[in-house]
Amino acid sequence: MTKTMLRALKGETLPTPPIWLMRQAGRYLPEYRATRAQAGDFLSLCYTPDLAAEVTLQPIRRYGFDAAILFADILLLPQALGADLWFETGEGPRMSTITDMAGVTALKGRDDIHETLAPVYETCRILARELPKETTFIGFAGMPWTVATYMIAGRGSKDQAAAHKLKDTDRPAFEALMDRVTEATIEYLAKQVEAGCEVVKLFDSWAGSLKGQDFEDFAVAPAKRIVSELKARFPGLPVIAFPREAGEGYIGFAEKTGADCVAIDNSVSPEWAAEKVQAGRTCVQGNLDPKYMVTGGEELVQATKRVVEAFRNGPHIFNLGHGITPEADPENVTLLVETIRGK
């Protein structure tokens, strides 16, 4: 097996960790901005296979990352389920809201999502053909809790108050929504794999707001269900889970869910994560602070070396603790890659 990313996901400790970055196709790259302008708007870019494939390939051409991640958005799935979705300039995504059981039952079934998502699958097929043979192709979806927070509130929020309120005041409606999203997520990811994705990543951006039993019920349990269902259909499929800001919840997350790798944010130190999460055997992904992609310089070099050193005694995929920001300097990414690969 020559793909370093797949070797790490199978538990191999490598002398140089494979590297890719969350949001590596993004606004910090001039070529991305040009392609997005050509598309007209963000959703058109997601739903135009040639252009979505192009922006996925751009950072691979520029940096030679070990993995490419499908260019899409976690909110395409709720849109395919029937939610209205739009993006407001400077404000981010907006959606129609679901506040009760009637809203849940009005959603489409899991087998009715594929017409809307067909362009995403076509993007996957293009990339499976065009990516370099050494580059691993990652598909992805949002985890049910995070997707549900947007569907309930109609927008992102810092505290996910609307979702917590529905969870605590109308548990049947909340659980029905989680079930509907979980089932659809399984079908969506299965289609991505059938179209050529070699790995899938589960993004639970707001997992950190789930505490105690809620974390077990609504972060761990849905992840376990999705992972087990996908692995039953696609034996050997590697899965990366990212329960962002889970803190102590990162410990044992891979074992509890069946994920092959747990991605870690930069709110925990690499040394803590190496001891408590990686423990010499569990593949971890992370966890450089994205700020260094803006600031650069010797600080970037030293922080990068610290992450590599912390995780060098077990399987590790180098990434950031969160997505690269639009303010990042493309030259700092070059410096990052050169530092890791010892050039």
UniProtKB/Swiss-Prot annotation:
Q: Name one GO molecular function term.
A: uroporphyrinogen decarboxylase activity
Instruction: Give Gene Ontology CC terms.
Output: cytosol
EC code: 4.1.1.37
- The protein's site described by Transition state stabilizer is found at 73
Looking up Gene3D superfamilies in the UniProt record yields:
3.20.20.210
Give the main localization category: cytoplasm
- Reaction(s) catalyzed by this protein? uroporphyrinogen III + 4 H(+) = coproporphyrinogen III + 4 CO2
Provide the binding site for substrate.
23-27, 73, 150, 205, 322
Which pathway does it operate in? Porphyrin-containing compound metabolism; protoporphyrin-IX biosynthesis; coproporphyrinogen-III from 5-aminolevulinate: step 4/4
- InterPro entries associated with the record: UROD/MetE-like_sf, Uroporphyrinogen_deCO2ase_HemE, Uroporphyrinogen_deCOase
Could you confirm whether the keyword Lyase appears in this record? yes
Top-level taxon in the UniProt lineage? Bacteria
What GO terms describe the biological role, i.e. biological process, of this protein? protoporphyrinogen IX biosynthetic process from glutamate
Keywords attached to this Swiss-Prot or TrEMBL record, sorted alphabetically, are: Cytoplasm, Decarboxylase, Lyase, Porphyrin biosynthesis
Q: Under which main EC class is this enzyme filed? A: lyase
* Cell compartment(s), UniProt: Cytoplasm
The UniProt subunit note reads as follows: Homodimer.
> Which family, according to UniProt?
Belongs to the uroporphyrinogen decarboxylase family.
Q: What does this protein do?
A: Catalyzes the decarboxylation of four acetate groups of uroporphyrinogen-III to yield coproporphyrinogen-III.
Q: What is this protein called?
A: Uroporphyrinogen decarboxylase
